[in-house]
């Protein structure tokens, strides 16, 4: 690839000085143990993908509390053992000269009801609306519940910083709890948390304010998926004005970045991508915007160099970062990308398809050469 591409120009993102604009997306992999603690081999997984110095990585979605764990084998950040495991991961990423934000989530009605019931926890959401017709009906969260959740996000953010993270990303996308408040397809409340564009956005805004107060705006990013049609989302009438309002409110908080995601697949079926440019323009050019959604090296370069040339665009990769731990190097050097194996994306507590994708020969040769020069 042309070395003059903006993909390989430095960028300040919050407190992080990135050397390039090829980022790793948050990727749920189900490799944590049954107590939501990262397995020891997760250190190698993240360190591998941090091997190109100056890379920006965001962790898999991480539960803010025991009550918010919607699935088995996803990591958490509510106790000392989890913090300790994450700190070892963050330290290894920093040793590679790269940066790591922890993505925080609560699942709401997207959780597996049986998983919550096994811990005697509520299956709850913004409203008593099932994710699909005939599905489990969640309990509507009370005012007290909502304030408790806002506080728990802030507590989780503080623990993430204690774990050595460079910042946190709020998962406000893909039909999970924050998104369940933002979109009218789920949120049918008539109190201050629903019934209008401003009220539906209130939960996302208040959660963001709480984590900003806890750790600082330059340590906070937010992920949105305005066009996402998974888990019952993307069908509301005022979708564009809803997300334009939310983006404008987030913009005024001075956050480290905004992430905009497109859903490339729904139930194994490829989807046509909607245009996120309206939200990029609303966000503006003063702070970074991360874009993700099935990019390859060619389309990533076009986004950075042509379509969003006037913006601090960072292109985030998911699947290709799974199968190419040296992805930024491969893209810059024009090295072919390895194919990924979908069958091992979500294999619980398994090293297969997790830490066994090889580095390119070219990367290993350059790395070996630089190591020799230091001796």
Swiss-Prot record:
SUPFAM superfamilies, per database record: FMN-linked oxidoreductases
UniProt superkingdom: Eukaryota
Short name of one Pfam family: Oxidored_FMN
CDD domains xref list: OYE_like_FMN
Location of the active site: 176
Gene3D superfamilies: Aldolase class I
Reactions catalysed according to its record: (1S,4S)-4-[(4-hydroxyphenyl)methyl]-2,5-diazaspiro[bicyclo[3.2.1]octane-6,1'-cyclohexane]-2',5'-dien-4'-one + 2 NADPH + 2 H(+) = (1S,4S)-4-[(4-hydroxyphenyl)methyl]-2,5-diazaspiro[bicyclo[3.2.1]octane-6,1'-cyclohexan]-4'-one + 2 NADP(+)
GO molecular function, one term: FMN binding
Entry keyword set: Flavoprotein, FMN, NADP, Oxidoreductase
Stored InterPro entries: Aldolase_TIM, OxRdtase_FMN_N, Oye-like
EC code(s) of this entry: 1.3.1.-
Binding-site list for FMN: 61, 103, 171, 223, 294, 319
Required cofactor names: FMN
Keyword NADP: yes
Family assignment from sequence similarity: Belongs to the NADH:flavin oxidoreductase/NADH oxidase family.
Protein name as catalogued: Aldehyde reductase FrzD
């Amino acid at each position: 690839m042309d070395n003059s591409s903006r993909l390989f120009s430095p960028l300040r993102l919050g407190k992080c000085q990135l050397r390039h604009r090829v980022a790793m997306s948050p990727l749920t992999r189900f490799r944590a143990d049954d107590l939501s603690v990262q397995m020891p081999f997760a250190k190698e997984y993240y360190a591998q993908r941090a091997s190109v110095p100056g890379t920006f990585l965001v962790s898999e979605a991480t539960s803010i509390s025991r009550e918010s764990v919607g699935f088995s084998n996803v990591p958490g950040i509510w106790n000392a053992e989890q913090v300790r495991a994450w700190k070892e991961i963050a330290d290894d990423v920093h040793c590679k000269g790269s940066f790591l934000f922890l993505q925080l989530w609560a699942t709401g009605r997207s959780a597996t009801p049986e998983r919550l019931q096994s811990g005697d926890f509520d299956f709850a959401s913004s409203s008593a609306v099932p994710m699909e017709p005939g599905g489990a009906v969640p309990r509507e969260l009370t005012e007290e519940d909502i304030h408790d959740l806002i506080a728990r996000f802030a507590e989780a953010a503080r623990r993430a910083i204690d774990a050595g993270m460079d910042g946190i990303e709020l998962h406000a996308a893909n039909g999970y709890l924050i998104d369940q408040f933002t979109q009218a397809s789920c949120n049918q409340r008539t109190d201050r948390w629903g019934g209008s564009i401003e009220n539906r956005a209130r939960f996302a805004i208040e959660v963001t304010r709480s984590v900003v107060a806890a750790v600082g705006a330059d340590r906070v990013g937010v992920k949105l998926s305005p066009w996402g049609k998974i888990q019952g989302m993307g069908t509301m009438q005022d979708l564009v004005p809803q997300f334009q309002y939310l983006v404008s409110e987030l913009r005024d908080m001075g956050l480290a970045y905004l992430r905009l995601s497109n859903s490339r697949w729904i139930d194994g079926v490829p989807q046509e991508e909607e245009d996120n440019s309206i939200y990029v323009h609303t966000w503006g050019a003063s702070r970074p915007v991360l874009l993700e959604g099935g990019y390859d090296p060619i389309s990533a370069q076009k986004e950075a160099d042509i379509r969003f040339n006037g913006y601090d665009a960072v292109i985030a990769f998911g699947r290709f970062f799974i199968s190419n731990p040296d992805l930024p190097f491969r893209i810059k050097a024009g090295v072919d990308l390895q194919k990924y194996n979908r069958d091992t994306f979500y294999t619980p507590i398994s090293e297969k398809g997790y830490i066994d994708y090889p580095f390119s020969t070219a990367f290993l040769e350059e790395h070996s050469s630089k190591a020799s020069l230091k001796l």
